[in-house]
Regions:
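Active-site groove signature of glycoside hydrolases
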Residues: 197-228, 277-291
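Substrate-binding surface in catalytic domains of secreted glycosidases
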Residues: 144-152, 226-352
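Glycan-binding loop/region signatures in secreted carbohydrate-active enzymes
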Residues: 171-180, 184-185, 323-392, 421-430
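Primarily a LysM-type cell-wall glycan-binding module
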Residues: 1-20, 43-70, 94
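Hydrophobic faces of well-ordered beta-strands that scaffold small-molecule active sites
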Residues: 106-110, 133-137, 168-172, 214-216, ...
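Acidic/aromatic/glycine-rich contiguous surface patches that form carbohydrate-binding/processing clefts
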Residues: 392-430
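Catalytic domains of carbohydrate-active enzymes, especially glycoside hydrolases
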Residues: 120-143, 201-214, 392-404
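Glycan-recognition patch characteristic of GH18 chitinases/ENGases
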Residues: 99-198
Length: 430
């Protein structure tokens, strides 16, 4: 049985294997470790324990364990002769009966930064293909004349998806000159001739590459274009051929009257009625230009999902999950150079390099640490690990959410994919 273990001082791959009844090779493989490197105090690993034995970790509760393993809380308590209010102790051994997994859908976004695409990124895409329902190629950019600017090597990426029975998504953005453009969007939404040409080009492109989901990631849409955007989506929906789906990206909102040009044009209720599913960007509370904090703290993410559920069926909701973290220089000041984006693997490597422990914020459900670099500058790092990912999986179960959407491929959390299939059955539609 897979469980998450937090590294303590003196732990090694060999000592953990012995303690939990696993093997060093399995721990190395499941966590993407370099056997020559030491573990970091506070690092979260997944370990395959013997049988159905579970060893209580910091922050655990019976409820959390029952969620993680898809076992009714009362059943877990009863089989271990515990009350529902029993206090657990770190290291305590529990027996966890086999649970029942539910099916969800999953998306991962691919955003190449080079032409041609780096082979390492292509290989990373192939490696996670078995865990995906959809592969989202970011992005086809809308143009003012109703045509599309295609990303590089589209056919190659679409073929990788279909070979793994994954549906390639045609992701269309309103990006112009590197930024999301309200003006560009207005042209498409308000000119019927251009709009119809635009939809025709989209459908022809989707057919050409076998992309059976049409996905609009229109951001920074002018508030006055809210109803025009809804009408546009209805227009696309009526023209979709049989066997195709329509989806959109939504910014994270907690109310229908949330103010700000970033939020107002995204109509959760209308889009929930029109499209087949939505991807909600439940991340970037901690962002490159803001103060250091968790990128997707569990509390705010839950608030967004609860609001979304009040506007649409939960099975239509794909919760956004960041695969990246950020490294901020301190002290933070507005106007500082942006924080550096890093992967989970890179974050742990930094903690190892500077010999600092990784801490875990149980309120935010996110790992973090501080270090001083060679120039004496202090840094603060927030990232994702197996604990924070598992907390999001538990939230999906609690809220009955239809799936998860990862941004983006190439920023590895090695444990994520094993945990995903331990928690859920991934729907394949290809």
């Amino acid at each position: 049985m897979i469980q998450i273990v937090t590294v303590r001082s003196g732990d090694s791959v060999y000592s953990l294997a012995s303690k939990y009844g696993s093997t060093p090779d399995e721990i190395v493989k499941d966590n993407g470790l370099n056997p020559a490197e030491t573990l970091v105090v506070g690092q979260a690993l997944i370990v395959n324990t013997k049988g159905n034995n579970y060893y209580v970790q910091p922050g655990d509760s019976l409820y959390r364990i029952s969620q993680t393993y898809n076992v009714p809380l009362a059943s877990l308590a009863k089989v271990n002769n515990l009350s529902l209010k029993s206090i657990l102790h770190v290291g305590q051994q529990l027996y966890v009966p086999k649970g029942t997994k539910r099916a969800v859908e999953s998306i991962a976004y691919l955003q190449p930064s080079t032409i041609p695409i780096k082979e390492s990124l292509v290989n990373a895409t192939r490696a996670i293909n078995p865990f995906l329902t959809y592969l989202a190629y970011f992005s086809f950019e809308a143009k003012r004349d109703g045509t599309l600017k295609e990303p590089t090597e589209t056919a190659k990426i679409a073929n990788i998806a279909t070979q793994g029975k994954t549906i390639p998504m045609l992701v269309i953005t309103n990006i112009e000159n590197g930024n999301f453009s309200a003006d560009l969007t207005s042209v498409i939404l308000r000119d019927a001739t251009i709009q119809n040409k635009f939809i025709t080009n989209i459908l022809q492109t989707a057919e050409k590459y076998g992309m059976r989901d049409i996905h609009f990631d229109f951001e920074s849409v002018a508030p006055e274009d809210r109803e025009a955007y809804n009408r546009f989506l209805r227009n696309v929906k009526t023209r979709l051929p049989s066997g195709y789906t329509l989806s959109t990206t939504l910014v994270p909102k907690t109310s229908s009257n949330q103010k700000g040009k970033f939020f107002e044009a995204h109509d959760y209720k209308a889009q929930g009625q029109i499209v087949d599913f939505v991807v909600i960007m439940t991340y970037d509370w901690g962002w490159q230009g803001g103060p250091p904090m968790a990128i997707s703290p569990i509390g705010p993410v839950k608030e967004v999902l609860q609001y979304a559920k009040s506007q649409m069926p939960p099975q239509k909701i794909m919760m956004g999950q960041n695969l990246y973290g950020f490294d901020w220089k301190l002290p933070f000041k507005q106007g500082n150079p942006p924080a550096k984006a890093i992967s989970s693997v890179a974050a742990v490597a930094l903690a190892r390099k500077y010999n600092v422990p990784i801490r875990y914020d149980f309120a935010a459900q996110a790992p973090h640490f501080n270090y001083f670099d060679e120039n004496g500058v202090q840094h603060e790092v927030w990232f994702e690990d197996s604990r924070s990912v598992q907390s999001k999986f538990n939230l999906m179960k609690e809220q009955g959410i239809g799936g998860i959407s990862y941004w983006k491929i190439g920023l590895p959390i090695p444990q994520n994919w094993r945990l995903l299939v331990e928690n859920f059955t991934i729907t394949k539609k290809g």
